[in-house]
Amino acid sequence: MKEKLVIGNWKMNKSFGEADDLLNDIADKLQEYQLRTGVVMCPPYLYLELATDLADENDFSAGAQNCSEFDNGAYTGEISAEMLSEIGIEFCIVG
């Protein structure tokens, strides 16, 4: 059976400090509960490193909000799946 996931898409919300506080609050709550689902947090790109650092120490994963259909090239502002993988991102919202 496939693992069920709860995925939080933050859209374009939170400052860096607010993102840090929220991720820490979520990590604390996840330690209190024995969930039978995986949890993935998808903050804005600027906060992915913060999310991956906290995810490594806690019971959730970090995910991206989008990725490019291209592997590389002159696509300003795009981020490839390979780039995301290099920083430890295993999940991405597509669509």
Predicted regions, residues:
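Conserved N-terminal beta1-alpha1 strand-loop-helix module at the mouth
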Residues: 1-79
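Short beta-strand and adjacent tight-turn residues that come in two discontinuous sequence segments
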Residues: 94
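Short acidic/polar active-site loop segments enriched in Thr and Asp
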Residues: 90
